From Swiss-Prot:
Entry GO CC: cytoplasm
Name this protein carries in UniProt: N-acetyl-gamma-glutamyl-phosphate reductase
PANTHER family: N-ACETYL-GAMMA-GLUTAMYL-PHOSPHATE REDUCTASE, CHLOROPLASTIC-RELATED (PTHR32338:SF10), N-ACETYL-GAMMA-GLUTAMYL-PHOSPHATE REDUCTASE, CHLOROPLASTIC-RELATED-RELATED (PTHR32338)
Localization (cell): Cytoplasm
Molecular functions per Gene Ontology: N-acetyl-gamma-glutamyl-phosphate reductase activity; NAD binding; NADP+ binding
Main location as per UniProt: cytoplasm
Catalytic activity: N-acetyl-L-glutamate 5-semialdehyde + phosphate + NADP(+) = N-acetyl-L-glutamyl 5-phosphate + NADPH + H(+)
Enzyme class: oxidoreductase
Pathway: Amino-acid biosynthesis; L-arginine biosynthesis; N(2)-acetyl-L-ornithine from L-glutamate: step 3/4
């Protein structure tokens, strides 16, 4: 397997051929401390990796294995799951029982309540029986900038979705400190087509998505409840938001613009920038822009960086927060590697790209 003698932490990747799995393997391949010890899949089992992904060759051209519990537990210290919603929960309880720690890219453990997951992911719930309420309550929501201690001790880390990542990072400092009102929060997000995954979908075809911007799931997008859960837990009150995602004609990148009412309308953009800088001063993956400089998705492509900017409209007392991330890295695989680092006693951003390529 793609190992180097001084790599000491064995990581199995299950669901290796999707976008999340591919990004994870690329980051693990370049990481100085992690060894890719097992590649697993369902539909791709038996295929050679370099045939499936010739653009990302691995040493010794490993075969993607069937998902065999005993082999996974024998060969890994931590398992990174990049499986469709509903499927991760069929494997995770067995891994935890064998004392193997799990980082999960799906939504299966993002909710503290299994019943809430079932109501939001009703289609998946109808296909996959679950009785892992306790694991749902024990899973740590994987925002490393906020939950680093909990992640370091976790048996299972539930990686946030890409929209929640880009929305929560700018919002949480203001909500935590009571600087904004808890009602009337609006989030407008725009994401590239890779956010829809690698499985072919008609609306993601070039002829359908090119030269067009479209809103979708305007009411009831699945990430709405995920964002609300985290904001409510942080504030101690029930928070409802208005969240509208948009599909834009680019492959990768995500931009969220968040609107909230200031409790003190006299606060300036510089005041709000200071709030962000104070909270994230020790977080290499988060960079606060000068007032008047607004983040672009191009600036964060292929990086684990979140660029955040703030402005205040003093006419109406609103703060406007802008956040740009690469949806496949900071919004998915890179954030998972941050959790792997913390679980392994390593610096949070070790082995992760923080400087992009321009243009």
């Amino acid at each position: 397997m793609d190992s180097i003698n001084n790599k000491s932490i064995r990581v199995a990747v299950i669901g290796a051929s999707g976008y999340g799995g591919i990004q994870s393997i690329r980051l693990l391949k370049e990481h100085p401390d992690f060894e890719i010890s097992f590649l697993g899949g369902y539909k791709t089992a038996g295929l050679k990796w370099n045939d499936l992904c010739p653009f990302l060759p691995l040493e010794n051209d490993p075969t993607i294995n069937a998902v065999d519990l005993s082999e996974i537990t024998d060969k890994s210290d931590i398992v990174l799951l990049s499986l469709p919603n509903g499927i991760s929960s069929q494997l995770t309880p067995k891994l935890i029982k064998e004392k193997v720690r799990v980082v999960d890219l799906s939504a299966d453990y993002r909710y503290r309540s299994l019943e809430e997951w079932k109501s939001i992911y009703s289609v998946e719930s109808s296909k996959h029986s679950r009785k892992d309420e306790l694991l749902c309550s024990q899973a740590v929501y994987g925002i490393p900038e906020w939950n680093s201690i909990e992640i370091s001790k976790a048996k299972i880390v539930a990686c946030p979705g890409c929209f929640p990542t880009a929305s929560l990072l700018p919002l949480m400092p203001f909500l935590k400190q009571g600087i904004i009102e808890t009602d009337g929060i609006i989030i407008d997000s725009k994401s590239g087509t890779s956010g829809g995954g690698r499985v072919p979908k008609e609306h993601l075809l070039l002829a359908e998505s090119s030269e067009s911007v479209e809103p979708y799931s305007v009411v009831g997008h699945r990430h709405t409840s995920e964002i609300e859960q985290e904001l409510s837990n942080l504030s101690g009150s029930n928070i409802q938001i208005q969240f509208t995602p948009h599909l834009v004609p680019m492959v990768r990148g995500l931009l969220s613009t968040v609107y909230a009412r200031l409790r003190d309308p006299c606060l300036t953009a510089e005041d709000c920038k200071t709030v962000l800088e104070t909270v994230y001063r020790s977080c290499p993956s988060v960079e606060i822009q000068p007032v008047g400089v607004y983040p672009k998705t191009k600036w964060v492509r292929f990086t684990n960086k979140a660029l955040i900017s703030v402005q205040v409209d003093q006419r109406n007392g609103r703060v406007i927060l802008m956040s740009a991330i690469d949806n496949l890295i900071k919004g998915q695989a890179g954030q998972a590697i941050q959790s792997l680092n913390l679980m392994s006693g390593l610096p949070t951003c070790k082995g992760l790209p923080l400087i992009g390529y321009y243009p």
